[in-house]
């Protein structure tokens, strides 16, 4: 019985160590992911927008809740509260950072089909146009974008 109790104690200690390591990795990943997504949102839509990830343990598993902020407040339904352009841009930023953080390192190529169909307004479109080459260079990524939108012409354009 004593041996079984010692074994249980060892297992519980190991579980605590794994939990501490997992939380450290989550904080590090959160910092990298949130900074890229927030920067994209701020660049295009203004500094009042932000992004964070809330990690929560449920039934022995960690779940991540992706949260868009406006003026520091959580948007419960960002699609209806801000429009699809915010979602389009956040989705792109999440795709980009997932490629950058993937291990083993993957080829940094991302093909997108109409990624900004919900971005409306000349000022927002111009900001997206300026953001794309900057992100591609900074994150060492190649972007291939299929679109019928003339406003999205960035870099080398191939028409079919």
Where do the model's predicted regions map?
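Charged, surface-exposed helical/loop "interaction arms" that form contiguous linear patches used
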Residues: 1-50, 55
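ABC ATPase nucleotide-binding domain "signature" loop
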Residues: 117-119
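Flexible glycine-/small-residue-rich
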Residues: 53-57, 68-72, 94
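C-terminal lobe/lid and adjacent interdomain/linker elements of RecA-like ASCE P-loop ATPase modules
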Residues: 125-160
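Walker B catalytic acidic pair
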Residues: 113-115
């Amino acid at each position: 019985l004593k041996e079984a109790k010692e074994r249980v104690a060892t297992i519980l200690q190991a579980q605590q160590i794994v939990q501490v390591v997992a939380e450290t990795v989550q904080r590090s990943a959160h910092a990298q992911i949130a900074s890229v997504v927030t920067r994209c949102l701020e660049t295009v839509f203004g500094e009042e927008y932000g992004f964070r990830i809330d990690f929560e343990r449920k039934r022995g598993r960690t779940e991540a809740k992706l949260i868009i902020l406006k003026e520091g407040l959580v948007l419960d339904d960002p699609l209806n509260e801000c429009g699809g352009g915010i979602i389009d841009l956040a989705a792109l930023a999440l795709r980009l950072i997932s490629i950058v953080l993937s291990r083993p390192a993957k080829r940094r190529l991302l093909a997108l089909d109409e990624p900004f169909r919900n971005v409306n307004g000349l000022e927002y479109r111009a900001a997206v146009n300026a953001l794309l080459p900057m992100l591609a260079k900074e994150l060492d990524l190649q972007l291939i974008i299929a679109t019928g939108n003339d406003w999205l012409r960035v870099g080398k354009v191939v028409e079919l």
